[in-house]
């Protein structure tokens, strides 16, 4: 973004390791940041008393395939990937009925830990993170 530091208005949080998450989310909420989150993370934050919008409310589509598909949706990735300096991109995002996602908080499934524990192959496969990697790549692509 050419105009300087981007104000953070909306954050997407999707984490498997939740250490210190309450503190971070409370900090963001205290500064007026809207928090959008995936199922397990949203449940955790709500239990901690924070206001959270679930990703499925954002997309209008539930998490599917036992949680394998949560954030792989245009209404999640477009607000991260759109070119903030391009009025056409901003207009297209608005036409979708969406708003920018300014901050991504992600950590990946603990594949290495599961692998080292010699867990069953099925457990290892379930701990290959797809959506988290896609979110990080989308955020990196639009970082300036």
Each model region followed by its residue ranges:
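A generic local secondary-structure boundary/capping motif
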Residues: 1-2, 66-70, 90-96, 124-127, ...
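N-terminal glycine-/serine-/threonine-rich phosphate-binding loop
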Residues: 1-37, 41-58
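Internal alpha/beta core interface subdomains
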Residues: 6-9, 98-144
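Helix N-cap/beta->alpha junction signal
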Residues: 17, 38-39, 84-86, 132
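Short glycine/serine/threonine-rich phosphate/pyrophosphate-binding segments
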Residues: 20-21, 88, 133-138
